[in-house]
Amino acid sequence: MSRQKKSRNIVDVMPQRKSDKSQISPASYARPSKKLTRYELDAKAREDKKKKKHKGLTSGSRHSRSEQHNNQQMQEKRDPRLGSRKKVPLVVEFVNNPEKGQFIQPVQVQPAEEKVKKLDPMLELEQLENNECLNQLLDALDEGKTISAEDQKFVDECLDRIAQLMDELGIEDEEESEDDLLRTFEKIDINQFK
C-alpha cells in the first residue's frame, strides 16, 4: 500500500507577505472543521492587535505639543508692524529713465574746504615739511627733471602754504650767503676732525 503525500499549504510554512495581505483575509486561513494552525493563530492575533484601541500617546508627542504651544505664544507676542513681507530690491534696477519719470537724485557732497578742520599752524607746517610726495618732487626739480603740470601746481601750492605759515608763526627762512659760507669754511680747524 502506497502512501499518498499530503500537500502542505504555503500559508502553514511561510510568513505572509504584505502584498498578499490585501488579497487573503485571516478568515480564509481557517479550515472548516479542524483546529487553527500556529501560523493562522498568529495572523489572527496580529489582526486583532491592529483593531484594538491603542492606549497612550504617540512617541515624541511631548516635544511636538510644546513646539505648538511655544509657537502660539510667540505669535501672540509678535508686533504686527515688524517683519514686512514686502520685497526690498538689493540692486538699483534703473539709471535715470526720463521717459518713465524715474530719476536718481544726485548725492550732495560737501566741499573739501569745509571738511578740513583748521589745524594748528605749527602742526600743519610740520606735516607739509615731512610730506614725502612733496620732498620727492622737490628733489626731482633740483636734479633738473621735468614734472607734470599737476605736480608743478601741487608743489607751488605747498610752497605758498609753507610761506604763509612761516609768516604767521614769525619764522624767517635764513639763507646764508656764499660769503658767510666761505668765512665759516676758513675758520674751521681741520685738525679737529682727525
Curated annotation (Swiss-Prot):
Disulfide bonds: none annotated. It comes from Mannheimia succiniciproducens (strain KCTC 0769BP / MBEL55E). GO terms for molecular function: GTPase activator activity. Keywords: GTPase activation, Ribosome biogenesis. This is Der GTPase-activating protein YihI. One of its GO terms (biological process) is ribosome biogenesis. A GTPase-activating protein (GAP) that modifies Der/EngA GTPase function. May play a role in ribosome biogenesis. The keyword Calcium does not apply. The keyword Kinase does not apply. It comes from the Bacteria. Residues 37-48 have a biased composition (Basic and acidic residues). Residues 1-87 are annotated as: Disordered. InterPro entries: YihI (IPR007336). Interacts with Der. Pfam families: YihI (PF04220).
